């Protein structure tokens, strides 16, 4: 047993405490991090990391990862590698980093799978979900892996994340409706660990328990709704999650909707005229009426980009209000500073000639902004624009770039369009398209960890 490093670290801490010297101290680094003093934390972690202390290397790498800066992300990968031999946790975090990386190579994907597998074998149970997602999204990289067989083995061994992975597989394979009983059983068991199970349970009850939707005192709903609201009051569940559950309950496409229960939930988290109410009435008119929503929009507190976006959608789609593309454009322009989807709608207005003529450059600019903000539908629209050439010169290489990006983001109807573009793409244009795709991915994913991915990595 090697006691040298712990003894040295203890000695350094003692010297710091007694002599008030500015020597590296892991305890001080953690305290500084807790109070938001990242410079002090980074200085202590870095000095200790350079001396070979594994925990300090992990602390430094976590800080580099959380920064979101492209250069710091590259350094985080290097720092995690410093700790690989001594720490299964380092393998887990580097594996997740590589697995979540949008521009990862085939070699990096295989390395991620190996690291996550090694970490799991060493007792890091939190890697199962990212490992399953890696296999699910990259079947061509892992042709010999039977994900369902792996999940069956993990579930038989009692690993909680395997249950959640199973639900994702059901959704991805289009077999969700065939496994409602299994999903209900999983989520009843995993509510405390995975709050997203509240949404799944609401979906299951609407689809499989039609009699429940009109029985307010039904035991099945009490098992889901009341713990959800209690968890929200205790700070364990976000208002966003409650809103999502309310949206499920209000959706008639999932079953016999229950708008009254949805209203009761929303009244607790966001009394009218909160923005969640405006959106809910727009998407599911059963929770209100046009006059009620417009009244909410007229409130002084509604003078915000989200309200402008919703008004733009009302005039754009002609839903609840007469269609008026000019008014839609006006409201989308007001909203676009902070509402990314406003750029998408503007791009569609300009692309489709809703204002009386096509504005191709405005369409490209708006759609590209939306696409780079994470809107897969904008990538698909750009692929259509460049492949069809309405008001713009046909450019199949550009069309290939955006069709590929739409496919990578999981837009289901983009695959047929991509295949059609490929069939008409000359070899030289294919090469140019690949080069432009790489450049666009670098521009888009220079900071390639989204806030959601970063949070997922840190929570898992």
UniProtKB/Swiss-Prot annotation:
A lipid is attached at residue 18 (S-diacylglycerol cysteine). It is a lipid-anchor. The keyword Membrane applies. One of its GO terms (cellular component) is cell outer membrane. The keyword Membrane applies. InterPro entries: Sel1-like (IPR006597), Sel1_AlgK (IPR050767), TPR-like_helical_dom_sf (IPR011990). May be involved in the polymerization of mannuronate to alginate. Coiled coil: none annotated. Residues 1-17 form the signal peptide. The gene is algK. This is Alginate biosynthesis protein AlgK. Belongs to the AlgK family. One of its GO terms (biological process) is alginic acid biosynthetic process. A lipid is attached at residue 18 (N-palmitoyl cysteine). It is found in: Cell outer membrane. Pathway: Glycan biosynthesis; alginate biosynthesis. Keywords: Alginate biosynthesis, Cell outer membrane, Lipoprotein, Membrane, Palmitate, Signal. Disruption phenotype: Cells do not encyst.
């Amino acid at each position: 047993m090697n006691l040298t490093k712990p003894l040295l670290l203890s000695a350094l801490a003692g010297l710091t405490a007694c002599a008030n010297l500015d020597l590296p101290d892991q305890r001080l680094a953690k305290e500084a991090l807790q109070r938001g003093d990242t410079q002090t934390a980074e200085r202590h972690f870095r000095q200790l990391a350079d001396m070979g202390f594994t925990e300090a290397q992990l602390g430094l790498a976590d800080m580099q990862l959380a920064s979101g800066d492209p250069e710091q992300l590259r350094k985080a990968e290097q720092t995690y590698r410093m700790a690989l031999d001594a720490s299964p946790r380092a393998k887990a975090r580097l594996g997740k980093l590589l697995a979540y990386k949008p521009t990862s190579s085939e070699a990096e994907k295989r390395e991620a799978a190996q690291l996550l597998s090694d970490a799991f074998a060493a007792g890091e149970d939190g890697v199962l979900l990212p490992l399953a997602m890696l296999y699910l999204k990259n079947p061509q990289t892992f042709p010999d892996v039977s994900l369902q067989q792996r999940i069956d083995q993990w579930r038989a061994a009692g690993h909680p994340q395997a249950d959640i992975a199973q639900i994702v597989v059901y959704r991805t394979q289009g077999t969700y409706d065939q496994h409602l009983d299994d999903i209900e059983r999983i989520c009843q068991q995993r509510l405390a660990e995975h709050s997203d199970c509240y949404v799944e349970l609401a979906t299951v009850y609407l689809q499989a328990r039609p009699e429940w939707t009109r029985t307010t005192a039904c035991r099945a709903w009490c098992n889901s709704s009341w713990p959800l609201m209690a968890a929200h009051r205790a700070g364990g569940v976000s208002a966003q999650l409650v809103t999502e559950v309310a949206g499920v309950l209000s959706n008639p496409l999932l079953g016999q909707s229950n708008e009254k229960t949805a209203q009761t939930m929303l009244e607790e988290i966001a009394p009218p005229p909160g923005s969640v109410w405006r959106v809910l009435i727009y998407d599911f008119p059963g929770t209100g009426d046009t006059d009620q929503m417009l009244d909410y929009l007229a409130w002084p507190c509604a003078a915000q980009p989200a309200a402008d976006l919703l008004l733009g959608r009302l005039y754009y789609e002609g839903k609840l209000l007469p269609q008026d593309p000019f008014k839609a454009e006006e409201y989308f322009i007001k909203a676009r500073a902070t509402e990314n989807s406003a750029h998408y709608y503007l791009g569609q207005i300009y692309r489709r000639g809703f204002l009386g003529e096509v504005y191709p450059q405005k369409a490209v600019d708006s759609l590209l902004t939306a696409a780079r903000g994470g809107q897969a539908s904008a990538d698909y629209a750009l692929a259509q624009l460049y492949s069809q050439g309405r008001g713009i010169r046909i450019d199949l290489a550009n069309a290939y770039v955006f069709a590929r990006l739409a496919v990578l983001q999981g837009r289901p109807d983009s695959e047929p369009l991509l295949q059609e573009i490929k069939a008409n793409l000359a070899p030289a244009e294919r090469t140019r398209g690949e080069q432009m795709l790489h450049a666009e991915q670098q521009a888009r994913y220079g900071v390639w960890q989204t806030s959601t991915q970063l949070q997922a990595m840190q929570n898992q």
